Amino acid sequence: LSPACPRVTDDALARRLLAAVPTLARHSCVNDVGPTFGCVIASTSLPHVFEHLVIDAQVRACASFTDITFVGTTEWLDERAGLARVEVNFADDLIALRAVNDALAYLNGEVVA
């Protein structure tokens, strides 16, 4: 993340995210608040949002792959520096690459001034 970017979402960003990608709220998510990503979307790290955007894009692009479950993890490596590790599985490398690029473009458009 750029030094100027926020590290955590807020209510306004959460509303914009859910307006653009309503299915994010229903993603399963291991967290301390509840069973879905919607429980934490208004106060979670931007890398965590990125993880779920990538997963969501892959689910939509791979709708014909009915036996695949997409999972991911996110951890800060250095929050002050904006460095995080985000890992997601994938079924198709080109679809995954597109999902990563689209998620980055979307987040940059939302948070980079």
Residue ranges and their predicted role:
Residues 1-26:
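Active-site-proximal helix-loop elements at catalytic-domain edges
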Residues 18-95:
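M16/MPP (pitrilysin/insulinase) zinc-metallopeptidase core fold and M16-derived inactive scaffolds
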Residues 28, 112-113:
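Basic polyanion-binding and macromolecular-assembly surfaces
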Residues 88-112:
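M16/insulysin-pitrilysin zinc metalloprotease superfamily fold
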